[in-house]
Structures are given as C-alpha cells and as structure tokens.
Amino acid sequence: MKTSNTKTPKPVLIAGPCVIESLENLRSIAIKLQPLANNERLDFYFKASFDKANRTSLESYRGPGLEKGLEMLQTIKDEFGYKILTDVHESYQASVAAKVADILQIPAFLCRQTDLIVEVSQTNAIVNIKKGQFMNPKDMQYSVLKALKTRDSSIQSPTYETALKNGVWLCERGSSFGYGNLVVDMRSLKIMREFAPVIFDATHSVQMPGGANGKSSGDSSFPPILPRAAAAVGIDGLFAETHIDPKNALSDGANMLKPDELEHLVTDMLKIQNLF
C-alpha cells in the first residue's frame, strides 16, 4: 500500500459506511471489519459521517446530525477500541467533533475553505483534506500549508516530512472528466506526496456525480481495481466505504464494497506493496 521509501510507520486503512444510518448498522459493519482492524500491519480507522451536507437533492438522507452522530461514533470507539474519522462541513463543528474523532476530514468541495481548514487544524486531530474534483493536485500544497502554518507558524513550505510530523494528510478521490464522471490521474499521487502523505479513496474515485436522478451513482466493479494501481504508484493508505448491504445503503451504495471484498482488496494491496 506504500512503497519502501514511505516514512509512515504502517499503511493506513480508513473504512466504514458513508453515513451513519443507525447504531445497529454501525455495529454490524464494525464487527465485520474486525479482521482488518486487528491486522498488525495496518493502522486502522473506522469512518462514518454524522451529516452528508452536500447531497445532490434536498430529499436525500443526510444522517443523524452532529450530537447524535458523535454519540454513536463514541459508542463504537468504546465498544471496539477503534480510532475514528469523521468529516466536518462547518467551522463550529471542528472542536466538538475532535472530542470523539482522531481524524477530522475536510470534504473535497471545501478543500480551499480557509476558515474551516484553520479551525480543524487548531484541534489535536489529524487533518485529512480531500482533493477537490476541480483541483490541480499541485495546488493542494496551499491547502496543506494553511493547515501546517496553523499548527506551526514557522513552517514556510510544505514537505512530506513536515506534514507527516504535524498530522496533515491529503486524500485523492478523482478529478472531473466532463459532466457526471470522474477519472483518476495516477500522476497526482506522486505530485501530492511531495508535500504530504496521501490516502487513496477507492470508492468515491469511481463515483458518477449526479448520475442517478438527484443522487450520485457509480460502478462497484471499479473500486477493487484502481487501488491496486495506486498501491503500485505509492500511497500511504486506503480510504474505502463499506456496507453489509450496499444496494440498500442510504448514501453512495453504488460505490461501496462489502467487508469481505474490502478484505480481499487490502490483502492484494499489501502484496503489491512488497514488490517495491
């Protein structure tokens, strides 16, 4: 999952459902992810969103909200011992979410929002900034620098080492390719790893924005393929959304992997890592 010259101690795995549907649903997924969470070769984080604030349609399910969502994530943390990732969409959410989450994620659409990046960077959580579908990967260095300078004002330019030390990561999730489609330019992984650790988002990278009459669609045959290519290029970790029953998931089901599919994928990626 990372090449031999990578300085992160272990490959990172971030996995869980797109959005919190219920505590029972979180538990069922968390149980299925235990083999991966217990893999000593991986640095595992359980992920779920308390609010999907950028759904295409007003009618789409968003989640339980900040307070109830964080309570459920804290329950998973307590019961399973998992570290937690969740995303924040507004500045006021950062300090509250950081009481539960070990990683706070900046959504791709908000990757240039200075106030949000600064507020998240003022917490003790790792900052995971998703590259916007509209962004030149090289320009993500400026988002990284916003976070780094918030944490250490003496930093003048971002490097992989300073970003790793200060807990600032980037996440590749594809680039717009005309309307309603995304592609992954594998060159972006190398470009962004010049100034930050890079996580590859296996499931959102195959999304088709707005492709399902008010909802995003995707092709679940591709999430097992692109991460293998990313592992060969060199990455620091994998982000993948997973669900027991993807077809009936309340958000992004078309892109999700079942837990057993994710386990097979990670096994293959670790094998690829050993080739380099």
UniProtKB/Swiss-Prot annotation:
GO cellular component: cytoplasm
Catalysed reaction, written as an equation: D-arabinose 5-phosphate + phosphoenolpyruvate + H2O = 3-deoxy-alpha-D-manno-2-octulosonate-8-phosphate + phosphate
Localisation: Cytoplasm
EC top class, as a word: transferase
Record flagged with keyword Cytoplasm: yes
MF annotations from Gene Ontology: 3-deoxy-8-phosphooctulonate synthase activity
Pathway stated in the Swiss-Prot or TrEMBL entry: Carbohydrate biosynthesis; 3-deoxy-D-manno-octulosonate biosynthesis; 3-deoxy-D-manno-octulosonate from D-ribulose 5-phosphate: step 2/3; Bacterial outer membrane biogenesis; lipopolysaccharide biosynthesis
EC number: 2.5.1.55
NCBIfam families: KDO8P_synth, PRK05198.1
Family note: Belongs to the KdsA family.
PANTHER family tied to this protein: PHOSPHO-2-DEHYDRO-3-DEOXYHEPTONATE ALDOLASE
Protein name, entry field: 2-dehydro-3-deoxyphosphooctonate aldolase
Protein's organism: Helicobacter pylori (strain J99 / ATCC 700824)
